[in-house]
Amino acid sequence: MGWGTGPPSWSELERVLSGRPGRTDPEAMYPGDGGDSPAWSRKREPYLAEPIRPVDRPTVPYAELHAHSAYSFLDGASQPEELVEEAVRLGLEAIALTDHDGFYGTVRFAEAAKEWGIATVFGAELSLGVARPAPRRSARKAARGRGRAVRYAATPEFEHAAAPDSAPRTGEPDPPGPHLLVLARGQEGYRRLSREIAAAHLAAGEKGVLRYDIDALTAAAGGHWHILTGCRKGHLRTALADDLAAGETGLPRAEAALRDLVERFGADRVSVELTHHGVPADDERNALLIALADRVGLPVLATTGAHFAGPEQRRRAMALAAIRARRSLDEMAGWLAPAGGAHLRSGAEMARLFAACPDAVANAVALSRECAFDLRLIAPQLPPFAVPDGHDENSWLRELVLRGAARRYGPPHANPPAYRQLEHELEVIATLGFPGYFLVVHDIVSFCERNGILCQGRGSAANSAVCFAIGITNVDPVANELLFERFLSPERDGPPDIDIDIESDRREEAIQHVYARYGREYAAQVANVITYRGKSAVRDAAKALGFSPGQQDAWSKQVSRWTGVGAETGTDIPEQVLRLAADLEGLPRHMGIHSGGMVICDRPIADVCPVEWARMAGRSVLQWDKDDCAAVGLVKFDMLGLGMLSALHYMIDLVREHEGVEVRLHELDLKEPAVYEMLSRADSVGVFQVESRAQMATLPRLRPREFYDLVVEVALIRPGPIQGGSVHPYIRRRNGTEPVTYDHPALENSLGRTLGVPLFQEQLMQMAVDVAGFTAAEADQLRRAMGSKRSPERMRRLKERLYRGMAELHGITGEVADRIYEKLYAFANFGFPESHSQSFAALVFYSAWFKLHHPAAFCAGLLRAQPMGFYSPQSLVADARRHGVPVHGPDVNASLAEATLENGGREVRLGLAGVRHIGSELAERIVAARVEHGPYTSVLDLTGRVELTVAQAEALATAGAFDSVTGPSGAERSGGRRAALWAAGAAARERAHLLPGTGPAADAPALPGMSALELAAADVWATGISPGSYPTEFLRARMDELGVIPAGRLLEVRDGSRVLVGGAVTHRQRPATAAGVTFLNLEDETGMVNVVCSVGLWTRYRALAQSASALLVRGRVQNAEGAVSVVAEHLQLLSLGMGSRSRDFR
């Protein structure tokens, strides 16, 4: 299928940026999307048709009107694009997508069909509930009126609330309940069907449960649907089977079912569906159906009832059926489809199968022509934004901009360029009809500001002076000479894209504000399709093949997160499991929810795409992902949770509370040398965006001295790693080891600030303006065309325009022109927007400032904001200790629910919520009871005030949270943590309904104390953190004997020396641009070590490297310019004596 892939190697990109000769086919090298992605994008690129060899025989006209894709979730085995491609290969005139209870795959289906020029029909197979005795009609109407009004304001006349619920579609080989196959007759039919699917999903108030009312469906159709009698689960086939089982040759039940459909939907809106999968029983059944159709006066229509594209996918379809039923393939014997299979067939084959009834094939074609339409016709708009009297959207936006400009820029005469830019942007926004979009985003940002929620716009929105003036972004694009057209231009084929970063712990408030302001009917969150990846594919493949749960789990743990299943080597996973898992990989498994994407419509969203409940309370979610929404024209707003904003807010609060200092981020001195000196030492654990292995290797080489250096640093690591001796050409030029050169003097204007090396997407646009005379809007077209490869023809025209402009304006031709083009093409895919780097660089400085000046608050703020960032809480605490910050474990009389400060803000106290089995809610209750009634005096006192399970009480004791408690006899204190654990178990068993003293004895017998290693192991088990030590401390004597170099001393080791290092594995990382190289981060009590593992070494030690919690590594030191790493030659297991878990990344 024609979807884009990932980036090339770092070495290839570095060659291009350095201007060295090499490959001359950039189109083959640099796939990407030209978007705001840091390296390569997870954005789905537009579908591109690839050559298909059609069937080698004369075709009979045919249209397939009953087909399920993989978006029937475990009941279809082909991607929508695969169905379209096979339909094209078979010469079909049209194809319908009729997935179960949704339009999940319709956009991908429509995009592929548009590319191939095949007509599309849209429908769904509805899963009706099991029938139950119905109340009188009037009572049912009343019940429906009450049903969902509180939660979802759907059309009241089509309520479903009193209907029976559908049965779960998983866990059973043949889920009970009838199906109804509905085809939308054009755009209006689609709208009505979408609304009814949404109403059914929402009526039951629970994700995955549907509640269709057949009477409501009847009323909703209005002549805009066409009903096929469906598969064996349809009303007609079910009734027919009942008649045959009862020996009723007159088929009374089947005839009644068919006449009921006619009465409900009309004789011209029902067709009797015939299927034939190549078995004799199909002929007998079809003959009976044809006779029934003649009796009732209905046409017949042939379908394949396809659940996969071609015969080669039948094995995959059978496996998915077993997975859906939670059974093995052996256990599914008798339930699976006949050997012929439900796959697409050509018109010629269908004509042969239905030779006795040729009209059935012709009728399919005729109906497809009546129903087909282009999905793009449904594109909605934003709702009108409520503005004050006397204003429209344009005038109100202008008013807000002028107010903000006065604050940001002063009066017009003080900054004429800024006001000229604002006027230009307002004209473009008005021309494109987007003022409402900016007003919506401004409203969200204003809500956050009013409620004390940290937020900022980022990405290409920071190129806009309008966004800066009205407070959406905090980067001045006029002062920084950023191109507005990178964000918005007259030629743009869609609304702008503004990402808002909101502190993650309060993002839900902003989301609920949008629901409250626009109504749940007009706003919804965007879906995230959860697809099969390596581990889940292996687990489910093993399950389908009948292996035990333990074996499934063991094999899934052997799968790398970086490679496809098909590339796995060195495992003991059976070949048959790997083969099937590779076949499943990439298929959708279920729907999730996007991290922050929301859409807002001028009409009920369900008119465009069905909505359903998410797992999270209070969230409704579209059936489309962000790429689907963009393709159809839904206006999406990204409210992204950013953990660092939460952490910064916590840091500000902690410093105010414990040190009496009010920190205002915008007032910090961005020129403070001490902050840059700290970062130049790569002392950046926990600092936003510059804490990764690659960033920490770059900081000592770059040695940032001013704010713009941080802007560069944020962008510099994109798209890939600084590997081995390979140094970014910008750093070589910055440090004077390589001269600053330009391929042509005309490039100095665009590349001078970055020493002749393109780093930002805005630069490539400026390059096109300077060397070829492009307008800024044309330059953005070039960037986007290069980035997404949307149209080869468009790319060819722009390339010709670029070469012609270079020749005419500056006489640039030949090799120089090719080099300029190659740089443009390479960086169109991977360049970071400078506006984005500017936004993030501020957060780099703010977080670094806290680390330097308030290290305890910095640590506690990061702990409160978990999960976030690159490092685990254990590593964050270890780094705080290395900076002289004492860290104390959780204590029932000293801790809050979350981490806090003590001793004037100089020490950190861990929170109770981080203790195993406790969580935030219970921790808050423990703290509240202490605040209300005073400190706890014993374990029994605590369990008397706050009910705990035995597991919870014992986890608190294991964490040392009772260390400050003295019991009546002092036994808890004298016996140490073991005595507290004894007392905790006994106290937790005391209950109000039991007589005092009838439970186990709370006083512990004499118990031995715990060693320092045992205490650290207990801390790690209970909280994941050993606050007073690091696990390697207890092995140091043995490690010294072995000659292990502590991490903190590696900088002293000469480059090229062979060393032995060791520590806990905190990260495993294999960037897509690293050509298979894997990086490990080891940590000991003195610091961290970056370990480089070649492809060969990783293959040799794969099982150990992938699973070990700690390692000894022998290798060669690379020590240059303050950055040190070890190139591994040998790996060996290091036993810590306690748990440790790594964070693995791409």
From Swiss-Prot:
<comment type="function">
    <text>DNA polymerase involved in damage-induced mutagenesis and translesion synthesis (TLS). It is not the major replicative DNA polymerase.</text>
</comment>
<dbReference type="InterPro" id="IPR012340">
    <property type="entry name" value="NA-bd_OB-fold"/>
</dbReference>
<feature type="compositionally biased region" description="Basic and acidic residues">
    <location>
        <begin position="12"/>
        <end position="26"/>
    </location>
</feature>
<dbReference type="GO" id="GO:0003887">
    <property type="term" value="F:DNA-directed DNA polymerase activity"/>
</dbReference>
<feature type="region of interest" description="Disordered">
    <location>
        <begin position="1"/>
        <end position="43"/>
    </location>
</feature>
<keyword id="KW-0234">DNA repair</keyword>
<dbReference type="GO" id="GO:0006260">
    <property type="term" value="P:DNA replication"/>
</dbReference>
<dbReference type="Pfam" id="PF01336">
    <property type="entry name" value="tRNA_anti-codon"/>
</dbReference>
<dbReference type="InterPro" id="IPR023073">
    <property type="entry name" value="DnaE2"/>
</dbReference>
<dbReference type="Pfam" id="PF07733">
    <property type="entry name" value="DNA_pol3_alpha"/>
</dbReference>
<dbReference type="InterPro" id="IPR040982">
    <property type="entry name" value="DNA_pol3_finger"/>
</dbReference>
<keyword id="KW-0548">Nucleotidyltransferase</keyword>
<dbReference type="Pfam" id="PF02811">
    <property type="entry name" value="PHP"/>
</dbReference>
<dbReference type="GO" id="GO:0003676">
    <property type="term" value="F:nucleic acid binding"/>
</dbReference>
<dbReference type="InterPro" id="IPR011708">
    <property type="entry name" value="DNA_pol3_alpha_NTPase_dom"/>
</dbReference>
<dbReference type="InterPro" id="IPR029460">
    <property type="entry name" value="DNAPol_HHH"/>
</dbReference>
<keyword id="KW-0235">DNA replication</keyword>
<protein>
    <recommendedName>
        <fullName>Error-prone DNA polymerase</fullName>
        <ecNumber>2.7.7.7</ecNumber>
    </recommendedName>
</protein>
<dbReference type="Pfam" id="PF17657">
    <property type="entry name" value="DNA_pol3_finger"/>
</dbReference>
<keyword id="KW-0963">Cytoplasm</keyword>
<dbReference type="InterPro" id="IPR004013">
    <property type="entry name" value="PHP_dom"/>
</dbReference>
<feature type="region of interest" description="Disordered">
    <location>
        <begin position="154"/>
        <end position="178"/>
    </location>
</feature>
<dbReference type="InterPro" id="IPR004805">
    <property type="entry name" value="DnaE2/DnaE/PolC"/>
</dbReference>
<dbReference type="GO" id="GO:0008408">
    <property type="term" value="F:3'-5' exonuclease activity"/>
</dbReference>
<dbReference type="InterPro" id="IPR003141">
    <property type="entry name" value="Pol/His_phosphatase_N"/>
</dbReference>
<keyword id="KW-0227">DNA damage</keyword>
<dbReference type="InterPro" id="IPR016195">
    <property type="entry name" value="Pol/histidinol_Pase-like"/>
</dbReference>
<dbReference type="GO" id="GO:0006281">
    <property type="term" value="P:DNA repair"/>
</dbReference>
<comment type="similarity">
    <text>Belongs to the DNA polymerase type-C family. DnaE2 subfamily.</text>
</comment>
<dbReference type="Pfam" id="PF14579">
    <property type="entry name" value="HHH_6"/>
</dbReference>
<keyword id="KW-0239">DNA-directed DNA polymerase</keyword>
<dbReference type="InterPro" id="IPR004365">
    <property type="entry name" value="NA-bd_OB_tRNA"/>
</dbReference>
<dbReference type="GO" id="GO:0005737">
    <property type="term" value="C:cytoplasm"/>
</dbReference>
<keyword id="KW-0808">Transferase</keyword>
